Amino acid sequence: MEDRIVTPLNIRGDAESEYSLRPKSLKEYIGQRKVKEKLKIFIEAAKNRKEALDHVLFYGPPGLGKTTLANIIALEMGGNLKITSGPAIERAGDLAAILTGLDDRDVLFIDEIHRLNRSVEEILYPAMEDYALDIVIGKGASTKSIRLDLPRFTLIGATTRVGLLTAPLRDRFGVLCPMDFYDQEELSEIVVRSCNILKIRIEPEASVEIGKRSRGTPRIANRLLKRVRDYSEVKGNGTIDLKTSKAALELLEVDKEGFDSIDNKILRAIIDNFNGGPVGIETLAYFIGEELDTIEDVYEPYLLQKGFIIRTPRGRIASDSAYKHFNKTRKSSNAYHKNLKQSSLFDGEV
């Protein structure tokens, strides 16, 4: 799964290219208009007051620019960026060491913050609220707590599973930023910007085609661009035109919807093996041989956003769009419309 060309997760070779293509300011940053508007106002206000920016939570599918925005915030605030992740902070002492190493206006970015263990998370509460670190020393009757002052820093949390955050942690973030999939026009613009930086010649129709198949995700758009560039240099004349881009994407097995073999495997399983659904997510994960979390975090968000699957109280069902994608006809529409009606009442995850 790590080497899947359309995965929104980081794979080998992404880090170097993402660094060179990463925008350095909100003005350069394409997409996420509402998030940018919020950040622009709050950053300017914090700078005018000579204060640290309030703590920020980014949540949404992977690959949408959370780390890039964290880097921009650090640059705008004139501080350094320290990057870590929830699973990497195993003990309270690990987090204490990070916090005491920060300076005023520095930004601490914790990816997968929903995976912090509870003892580590509790260290964050006074750090976020009071810029203080409570340390317990001694044992038994001689136990006492010492409070250390911390620099005025900004914590930025990122998560793909905001529902897994505890309420006490979530409530301590002053700026909440939901991240949405990018539209085709934004992705095409990102492709053109990347081409300018990498000195790649591309025709407008080709940038649209690559953007259309990028699953609403800039990371995927840039990854596809690099592979289409390779194809163009070997099979074409070095300029990416529409014909070349389509041929390259077909070779990569990325179809017009941005689906690859695994997406199609999921949809075919629901349609062919479970009569269009509903099928429980655990059953579906077992059937196609993938981890439950991988289905929910990586594959499902885009299929839901595209309207190819629908969540209901009884499980996932394939939509009419999914059937049309495979030129198939639903055997019975009565059960589908009944489940579809129930889905409007669905208020949780199955």
Curated annotation (Swiss-Prot):
Entry binding sites for Mg(2+): T67
Catalytic activity: ATP + H2O = ADP + phosphate + H(+)
Location of this chain's protein in the cell: Cytoplasm
Residues reported in the UniProt entry to bind ATP: L21, R22, G63, K66, T67, T68, E129, D130, Y131, R172, Y182, R219
EC identifiers of the protein: 3.6.4.-
Binding site for DNA: R311, R316
Small ATPAse domain (RuvB-S): annotated span: 183-253
Cystine connections: none
One Pfam family in the UniProt entry: RuvB_C
Annotated keywords: ATP-binding, Cytoplasm, DNA damage, DNA recombination, DNA repair, DNA-binding, Hydrolase, Nucleotide-binding
Residues covered by region (Head domain (RuvB-H)): 256-350
Keyword Transit peptide assigned: no
GO molecular function, one term: four-way junction DNA binding
One GO-annotated biological process of the protein: DNA recombination
Alphabetical list of Gene3D superfamilies matching this protein: 1.10.8.60, P-loop containing nucleotide triphosphate hydrolases, Winged helix-like DNA-binding domain superfamily/Winged helix DNA-binding domain
Region (Large ATPase domain (RuvB-L)): 1-182
Binding partners and assembly: Homohexamer. Forms an RuvA(8)-RuvB(12)-Holliday junction (HJ) complex. HJ DNA is sandwiched between 2 RuvA tetramers; dsDNA enters through RuvA and exits via RuvB. An RuvB hexamer assembles on each DNA strand where it exits the tetramer. Each RuvB hexamer is contacted by two RuvA subunits (via domain III) on 2 adjacent RuvB subunits; this complex drives branch migration. In the full resolvosome a probable DNA-RuvA(4)-RuvB(12)-RuvC(2) complex forms which resolves the HJ.
Family named by the database record: Belongs to the RuvB family.
Function: The RuvA-RuvB-RuvC complex processes Holliday junction (HJ) DNA during genetic recombination and DNA repair, while the RuvA-RuvB complex plays an important role in the rescue of blocked DNA replication forks via replication fork reversal (RFR). RuvA specifically binds to HJ cruciform DNA, conferring on it an open structure. The RuvB hexamer acts as an ATP-dependent pump, pulling dsDNA into and through the RuvAB complex. RuvB forms 2 homohexamers on either side of HJ DNA bound by 1 or 2 RuvA tetramers; 4 subunits per hexamer contact DNA at a time.
Comment on protein domains: Has 3 domains, the large (RuvB-L) and small ATPase (RuvB-S) domains and the C-terminal head (RuvB-H) domain. The head domain binds DNA, while the ATPase domains jointly bind ATP, ADP or are empty depending on the state of the subunit in the translocation cycle. During a single DNA translocation step the structure of each domain remains the same, but their relative positions change.
Name recorded for this polypeptide: Holliday junction branch migration complex subunit RuvB
Species whose genome carries this gene: Clostridium kluyveri (strain ATCC 8527 / DSM 555 / NBRC 12016 / NCIMB 10680 / K1)
Lineage: Bacteria, Bacillati, Bacillota, Clostridia, Eubacteriales
Gene: ruvB
